[in-house]
């Protein structure tokens, strides 16, 4: 769980902010912001983390990835659409370490989340050499270990609510 929480925290472009009155805010998108808040509320132990390289999120490939140095170890972290992340993973993390990826189980979980109307974000990681300084899409094609899925309520946008109301009263 800690590795999953650390991944959704560090492979994330949003930031938590606190103003002079002590009020919290989020910069960045609402999905990443929700993940950042979840990680913050978990009160993980502090680590020394340094971003080395990044592949920004793009709707064409549906993920973002970072190469991080975390407490003297190097890891590639990735978050994105579950179906895309599933296709990149051959293993999943368990209490006992990495085990074979159970695709059918996770596809059923994804379907269950979808039936509940949840927006889903999957996370995976892999250890790499501390000498690694670059990150490209090919680096993500093998060795990723699936960590889990976050399911979040995605309330309709105000314009969608207005459109539905207009249709109902037409």
Positions of PLM-derived features:
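Cytosolic catalytic regions of ATP/NTP-dependent phosphoryl-transfer enzymes
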Residues: 1-146, 152, 162-166, 170
């Amino acid at each position: 769980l800690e590795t999953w929480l650390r991944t959704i925290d560090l492979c994330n472009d949003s930031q938590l902010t606190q103003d002079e009155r002590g009020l919290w805010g989020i910069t960045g998108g609402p999905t990443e912001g929700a993940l950042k808040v979840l990680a913050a509320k978990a009160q993980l132990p502090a680590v020394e983390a340094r971003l080395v390289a990044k592949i920004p999120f793009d709707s064409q490939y549906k993920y973002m990835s970072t190469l991080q140095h975390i407490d003297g170890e190097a890891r590639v972290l990735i978050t994105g659409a579950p179906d895309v992340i599933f296709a990149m993973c051959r293993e999943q993390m368990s209490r006992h370490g990495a085990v074979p990826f159970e695709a059918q189980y996770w596809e059923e979980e994804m379907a269950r989340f979808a039936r509940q109307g949840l927006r889903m974000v999957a996370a995976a990681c892999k250890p790499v050499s501390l000498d690694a300084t670059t990150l490209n899409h090919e680096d993500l094609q093998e060795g990723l270990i699936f960590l889990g899925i976050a399911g979040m309520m995605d309330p309709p946008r105000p314009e969608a609510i207005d459109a539905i109301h207009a249709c109902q009263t037409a």
